[in-house]
């Protein structure tokens, strides 16, 4: 199922990129969005998560953690390249290209109003909600 930002025109969007389903930090981040979903809905804000995982992986992740928002699959990295979130990482002494945890706030007209790079999960949701009300 294809999604485009124009599908959400007229609504604010939180587009968050995360490295991988079912890893500790990514799971904590998804659960933090889940737990704050009413605050986002109260402001008519759509949450979209995106990673390089498959649709099947996302479906299991959503079911396992009861996530009330859409996770998008970017297995060919097209969207990751557009948002420049693929960065070189050092994983166990080996260099690899992976998603840098990033969040983009997008306004009702489809313009990016705020970019968070190298996101730390703790306090991130509160930061987003504060910036969405400005």
Where are these regions (language model features)?
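Chalcogenol-based redox active-site neighborhoods
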Residues: 1-134
